[in-house]
């Protein structure tokens, strides 16, 4: 399983720290998905994936504002006590005292951005999908033959490079060798 550091996410998306309990290089994220905590704000946790970054936008913030401060704190404390890797507030929204207290109590990094929630989610998911995509390593030679890419693969020493050299002598293009 691949991971990406919170520091890389912050740099890529130009996120500003609001509360950072530890070095963002040491916070590793393994989920490509993000979570806008609508159900969790209503105390439904059956499908709450704590490996995802939480995103708070206008809808989540408006819902929280509609609750009294004590209820708001209980909701946020329950969400952050499960220790998600980080939370991000979109649209330049200022965090409530209850949110700041809940992330501080539980050591969860809180970040902010002026981006719209939709833009933030799209950019974050695209970045995480690229960074956490499955990958494999193969020994091989990539050549172009009649406009098509061909990957010659095989065990070390079976003659992949020699085959590519013969193709190059016949006017084909080498793209990459090991």
What residues fall within each predicted segment?
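Amphipathic coiled-coil/heptad-repeat helices and related helical stalk/stem segments
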Residues: 71-72, 136, 160
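Charged, amphipathic alpha-helical linker segments immediately N-terminal to NTP-binding catalytic cores
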Residues: 83-86, 92-127
């Amino acid at each position: 399983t691949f991971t990406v550091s919170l520091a890389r996410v912050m740099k890529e998306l130009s996120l500003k720290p609001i509360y950072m309990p530890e070095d963002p290089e040491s916070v590793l994220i393994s989920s490509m998905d993000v979570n806008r905590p609508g159900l969790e704000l209503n105390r439904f946790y059956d499908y709450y994936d704590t490996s995802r970054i939480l995103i708070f936008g206008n809808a989540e913030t408006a819902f929280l504002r509609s609750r009294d401060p004590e209820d708001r704190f209980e909701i946020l404390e329950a969400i952050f006590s499960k220790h998600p890797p980080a939370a991000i507030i979109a649209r330049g929204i200022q965090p409530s005292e209850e949110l700041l207290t809940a992330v501080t109590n539980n050591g969860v990094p809180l970040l902010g951005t002026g981006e719209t929630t939709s833009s933030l989610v799209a950019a974050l998911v695209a970045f995480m999908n690229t960074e956490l995509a499955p990958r494999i390593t193969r020994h091989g030679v990539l050549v172009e033959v009649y406009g098509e890419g061909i990957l010659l693969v095989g065990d070390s020493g079976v003659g992949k490079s020699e085959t590519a050299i013969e193709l190059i002598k016949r006017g084909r293009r080498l793209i990459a060798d090991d």
